[in-house]
A protein has these predicted regions:
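Flexible glycan-contacting loops in extracellular carbohydrate-active proteins
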Residues: 282-314, 339-344
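Short, aromatic/His-centered strand-loop micro-motif at the edge of beta-sheets
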Residues: 238-260
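Short glycine/proline/serine/threonine-rich loop/turn segments at secondary-structure transition edges
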Residues: 116-127
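Short tryptophan-centered beta-strand motifs in secreted/extracellular beta-sheet-rich domains
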Residues: 186, 256-265, 270-272
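Bacterial Sec-dependent N-terminal signal peptides
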Residues: 1-40, 143-154, 423
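Extracellular, beta-strand-rich glycan-interacting domains
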Residues: 180-192, 308-333, 345-358
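Extracytoplasmic low-complexity segments
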Residues: 145-163, 336-423
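Extracellular glycan-recognition modules
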Residues: 156-234, 325-329
Length: 423
């Protein structure tokens, strides 16, 4: 588990403080900075040092405490969703003294205990916002330098669904959506990258536009690896988003390694991100993108006829937004996000399931109309964390197509399926 000490106050220098004395934390002064460290299984320690800008003729008694408001402010300023570290994960002495004639107290030692397995599996960064104040308000604090955030980053683990052969994963919507700005994101790990003129589907969302009262199925998005027409490397995501024309990513994917894939449409400006880096940009062909409820988003195959062969496509942390997420928001919240975050329309963690039955297309591979022939199938069902959307499901072409659900996998971007940092 890694930790991060951060303070967001540019150019604070205690030597420049004039007027009445001020109280602050020595570590929280200067330019905005971060210090990372590893907390081993047997725990670790970190120290902070309360300081005043000018010596006093008397002892100054201090209180060191956890400031939840400082964490709220940090999250707002940095587009993060850090959650408060439980008090079972840390210990420190809350009292300190700056002796008369001195400007610093003895260092305050914070003992940190590693995150539990369950805390790691939430995906949330657990943060400890440490602050200092004078007892009895005997001295004002130096605003912006009186607190810092100690952030314990989890090693992200999850149970993972694997799509194989003649099957696909589908997240349907409760209603059709017409959106001028939106975001789709997922964690993705392909077991291998095909060679040759073979197309496989990372994800697709069937949409439509209306022309003369007729629905034309051409909107939404499709993200492919490879192209049946050839000429596109199978490691490069290609396809079309909101009728923007075929685009090809400049960033190759790697087999058996976790990637964060995102499409952001901001009022018609489209960006494909791979691990927070721009794969390509494009312009939407329409003022708004329409998504069809019965199709939602499909993963692994365009249909149950299958084109994955022996591949296994692994997914988790699937999210669909009615807002354009910034690259900072994408990068800071890869492994978890609060289910009540504004603009979050659907959130399928895919980390647990129930077994049940669902209606899927019968003779047709795509639900493009309400009267599409449907048939009932046994399946896995995956809850939407927001409660706004129906369960996601797996459609398989035959009972011989297996369900594969692998527990406790490290899903960190850049790590292999076996949990090793890729070279």
């Amino acid at each position: 588990m890694t930790g991060l000490v951060s303070c967001d106050n540019a150019e604070l220098k205690y030597d420049d403080v004039t007027g009445p004395g001020r109280l602050f934390l020595n570590e929280a002064v200067g330019t905005a900075k971060s210090v990372s460290f590893v907390i081993p299984d047997d725990g670790s320690v970190y120290t902070v040092t309360p300081r005043i800008s000018k010596p006093l003729g008397r002892d100054l008694k201090l209180t060191v405490y956890v400031d939840e408001k400082a964490l709220d402010e940090y999250n707002k300023q940095n587009n993060t969703s850090y959650t408060l570290l439980p008090n079972t994960n840390y210990e420190f002495e809350s009292s300190a003294v700056i002796p008369a004639g001195k400007v610093v107290s003895n260092p305050v030692t914070i003992t940190l205990h590693p995150l539990t397995t369950e805390q790691n599996k939430t995906g949330f960064v657990h943060a400890l916002p440490i602050a200092v104040k004078a007892e009895g308000e005997a001295m004002q604090v130096l605003e912006g330098a009186d607190a810092f955030v100690l952030a314990a980053t989890p090693v992200p683990y999850s149970n993972v669904v694997e799509i194989t052969g003649n099957s696909y994963l589908q997240t349907r919507f409760a209603e059709d959506y017409k959106l001028s700005s939106w975001t789709f994101e997922t964690l993705f790990n392909p077991s291998q990258i095909y060679t040759g003129n073979t197309t496989t589907w990372l994800a697709s969302a069937i949409g439509y536009y209306e022309q003369g009262g007729t629905k034309i199925i051409q909107d939404g998005f499709m993200l492919r690896l490879g192209d049946s027409g050839g000429g596109t490397k199978n490691s490069l995501i290609n396809g079309m988003v909101s009728r923007s024309g075929k685009q090809i990513s400049s960033i190759p994917l790697q087999s058996n390694i976790w990637h964060h894939i995102a499409i952001v449409c901001d009022e018609g400006d489209i960006t494909l991100y791979v691990n927070g880096n721009v794969g390509y940009t494009a312009k939407s062909g329409y003022a708004a993108t329409q998504f069809y409820a019965l199709n939602g988003i499909r993963f692994g195959n365009e249909s149950a006829s299958g084109n994955l062969g022996s591949l296994r496509y692994r997914y988790c942390q699937v999210r669909f937004w009615s807002v354009a997420r910034s690259v900072e928001e994408l990068n800071n919240n890869r492994y978890a996000v609060p289910a009540d975050t504004p603009g979050l329309l659907g959130y399928w963690k895919l980390n647990e399931y129930t077994e049940g039955k669902a209606m899927v297309p019968g003779s047709s591979v795509k639900c493009i109309e309400e009267d599409t022939p449907m048939t009932e199938t046994e399946t896995y069902l995956f809850k939407d964390a927001t409660g706004k959307q129906p369960d996601a499901l797996i459609h398989r072409a035959s009972a011989n197509t297996p369900y594969i659900f692998t527990p406790d996998k490290r899903i960190e971007v850049g790590y292999t399926w076996d949990g090793v940092l890729a070279q």
